[in-house]
UniProtKB/Swiss-Prot annotation:
The modification Phosphoserine is found at residue 364. Monomer. Interacts with CLOCK. Residues 1-46, 443-465 are annotated as: Disordered. Induction: Expression in the liver oscillates in a circadian manner with peak levels at CT8-CT12. This is Protein O-GlcNAcase. Optimum pH is 6.5-7. Changing residue 175 to A: 3-fold increase in substrate affinity and 90% reduction in O-GlcNAcase activity. Regains appreciable level of catalytic efficiency in the acidic pH range. 70% recovery of activity in the presence of sodium azide. Changing residue 177 to N: 2-fold decrease in substrate affinity and 96% reduction in O-GlcNAcase activity. Regains appreciable level of catalytic efficiency in the acidic pH range. 40% recovery of activity in the presence of sodium azide. It comes from Mus musculus (Mouse). The gene is Oga.
Amino acid sequence: MVQKESQAALEERESERNANPAAASGASLEQSVAPAPGEDNPSGAGAAAVVGAAGGARRFLCGVVEGFYGRPWVMEQRKELFRRLQKWELNTYLYAPKDDYKHRMFWREMYSVEEAEQLMTLISAAREYEIEFIYAISPGLDITFSNPKEVSTLKRKLDQVSQFGCRSFALLFDDIDHNMCAADKEVFSSFAHAQVSITNEIYQYLGEPETFLFCPTEYCGTFCYPNVSQSPYLRTVGEKLLPGIEVLWTGPKVVSKEIPVESIEEVSKIIKRAPVIWDNIHANDYDQKRLFLGPYKGRSTELIPRLKGVLTNPNCEFEANYVAIHTLATWYKSNMNGVRKDVVMTDSEDSTVSIQIKLENEGSDEDIETDVLYSPQMALKLALTEWLQEFGVPHQYSSRQVAHSGAKTSVVDGTPLVAAPSLNATTVVTTVYQEPIMSQGAALSGEPSVLTKEEEKKQPDEEPMDMVVEKQEEAEHKNDNQILTEIVEAKMAEELRPMDTDKESMAESKSPEMSMQEDCIPDVAPMQTDEQTQKEQFVPGPNEKPLYTAEPVTLEDLQLLADLFYLPYEHGPKGAQMLREFQWLRANSSVVSVNCKGKDSEKIEEWRSRAAKFEEMCALVMGMFTRLSNCANRTILYDMYSYVWDIKSIMSMVKSFVQWLGCRSHSSAQFLIGDQEPWAFRGGLAGEFQRLLPIDGANDLFFQPPPLTPTSKVYTIRPYFPKDEASVYKICREMYDDGVGFPFQSQPDLIGDKLVGGLLSLSLDYCFVLEDEDGICGYALGTVDVTPFIKKCKISWIPFMQEKYTKPNGDKELSEAEKIMLSFHEEQEVLPETFLANFPSLIKMDIHKKVTDPSVAKSMMACLLSSLKANGSRGAFCEVRPDDKRILEFYSKLGCFEIAKMEGFPKDVVILGRSL
């Protein structure tokens, strides 16, 4: 089957060459203006731009490059990508996943029969959707350019791919060593000459295809030595590379905040052709904490007539790229004819572009330099509005039907490439397994896993991050809302697809858990009809728990999500506002401390008002997390859950810290004021919030992997109040275990009085509780300096306990309860000063056994330690019974370590410590 289709593909390619002799001979418009090798053409950039805009020239390549470091997308995701590209009027897909081993590391290996059929299916699907499929290969890691066998191996590999039906190719020499081996140095005068030589040879061997891309090793401004205009490497590329070959370029930097027109004119001049932009603005493979959901930005539509194309290299997570690709399409369509800005005339009154310009002029204060034809904020609104529809529809890639417009898509062995495993008895979803092109026999895990990215391979710019200037929320005019609604409705009406039938069924209040595909695993019961569902629907009684109904994701949720995960160099307006508010609350917290001298009621009111507003913003994040976790489209959820989980966790800590700042009695201004500005890169918005907490270096507490199965449950950590005492005592009593159960029911408060009573009474400033929907389920208590705390206990707490519990007779054998009572009447041992100098703070923590989420304990410990360090603590310790294995393990998982025995330590306890 493979050989038959390959022969047909070769015949088809030969007929295309005969029908287009100009393409076969390599003659093109670019060749007619590009200088001959070795000639100098100072006006080359302008000539390329003119030819690029002329009628009949090669089309502008605009689409997606799968070129990130990380697990490649699977075949069904790529087919879904083709559908979206066609829908949004984009035209190109470049296959270049760095971690597909046959693309880069083991580029010499040929594809197996199974892999070949998958590639043929993919190329055929791209053709059906009218998407140009460009196959890229990266031999630069270890190829010997002067070895004819190596060149023949590369030709044989690309010849195999061409037999699959591929017509467009790319040779990539990015992210490799500049040094040549000894054999190459004898043949080639420079690294650039070696690369250009093999690229030209491969290009001619393949029949000079219409689209052939070359990625230089100096692929951005910062990689050029000494600079772009004087780079010998780029000059060689411009002079020696055949004019029919296009050059990829990422802009001034690897991840370019902006790509100025002047920078493109500069590089076009030296490479003697307009480049194709490989855009990393939405790439997130260099930071495992970051996701980019902001709009395509920082690239004027004035670039379009000066380029041969733009290919965005987006997030590693496929479903997280809806906004990135959608806004790129909006950018491209705003000037897809390549019209120069100085000749742009007013569009017709009913055009989308005209309406967008009107809206931006009337209701926005966006930067003055905003493109006349393209508004990033409007493009983001349009993308999020359309993306919202996807969250209510379960994704089942393998069941999607494509409209045939030409060659038929092959099916491997008649089985879908991605199975749909059942996560539980009622929900059936498709788990997306991210793998390179592999044989069908490859083992697949049966459960969804949280995807992690490779360690940093590309270093973005080390420069400060700008925040988006917060826009004042103004009431939009009614006619503006109507116009926006009409735009979205018109777009949706024009772009109906097979999924829309599912949307209609969802609109009829059909539970998403009942949606099931025909190709699901056989032991799952078939889907019931609406009539059967109505007959068998359970109706709870008046005293029974009502049916659970999940709130749908809202447009406001997606806007908040985009603001929290915006772009590499800036946070969205809401994210920037939250960061500024937390920084202000932190720096001005001294005004609300109880012992603050010269209190200013106006400043106190301002602080509490802004704190309340900040807590409301944190609540919006929690609500967004809950609704997203319950959405019907589990495919989107799985791709983004780890990021949303991370921001939810850090915002929970930050909210608790702000609440603590507002109710403590001691001022910590000396520690909190005077930090540097919070502009940084690593970790995105969550990382910046972490750096503003006192224990920013406690990375183990901030590392909170999400659960294997997504959950929408949210816990609240807040400061302890006296009314919580009974609940904390109850947890303390229930979790205490001496091996035989609780033996003294007649004294229910005894354990609480012994373990937590003193801290709750005398150290309120450093006490937190954990809550869920049923009430308090955990506590974290501490005192910043145990020495004065013990003195206070001797004055007030111990006498009260001695009065409450009579000293038992020590002549007889004492029960466990009597031993505890006796401890109140005995002299307390004092820990050595040498130990307390490094670990001055005492902590006690416990969580009810019903709480199974391990991240909750880390968050509680982070809140407690933040409050202690904010008041100058260098370290904390806890005392644990040697036989209490559960609590020993509990503290160990929270970063506490056993302190070596020293003189003065109690003999009946183990002391664990943690440095701050």
